Amino acid sequence: MKSEILRLLKSSDTYLSGQQICEQFQVSRTAVWKVMEQLKKEGYQIEAVRNKGYRLVDSPDVMSKAEIESLISTKWAGRHVVYYGETDSTNTRAKEQGERGAEHGTLVIADKQNAGKGRRGRSWESPQGTSIYMTILLRPGIMPVKAPQMTLLMAIAATQGIRRVTGLEDGIKWPNDIVSLTGKKLCGILTEMSAEIDYINYVVIGIGVNVNQELFSQEIKERATSLCLELGHKVQRSQLIAAIMESFEKC
């Protein structure tokens, strides 16, 4: 319900009465008040005015299940979000979801990874509160030999999402990177799958986007960049996640 109430607040330019929210979601005023208090604790600025109702004043760069689900307007890509404040790897968690029978389009997101994965066993720097670490679970009806094409589709979706949200021009560096116009890495993609000879059980596509990161390790600082460094200002991560998922569904 929190995601739905947050979506309603974002869609309104004026105050929403508590009674209106109660009737729409068939809950009590106390339940609505509790949701508003939870949102305030998460950093949302919400005005509550007697005889007028509630109004969303400002949304911070919050990474949460409710925030992401309130922004995504797809039919299946990212409609179900599994969120971790901290985990080892979103690809690992997404593969667990795949083994448990999670639905096509399930999106696993973390605010921090302790063992982020790159290609060829490399690690992916994943500090807290700065960037996007997410993996989408897919159950495509294609032959395993065609699975690598899905990496390219995600790369296209990511470039489109970045341009839509920020206006920044970037490019795809085959097979799995997105780079700035100066050639520095903004984003990496890792695709893994569980398959038989002629059948895919599931595919997981992990994507890491350097969004608001300003410092990189000595090892990669000469070849890595972030949207914040390129633009000169910070970007709301949840908004970018939604844009990438919407572009991916259309690919």
Segments predicted by a language model, with ranges:
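Short connector loops at helix/strand junctions that flank enzyme active sites
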Residues: 103, 127-131, 173, 184, ...
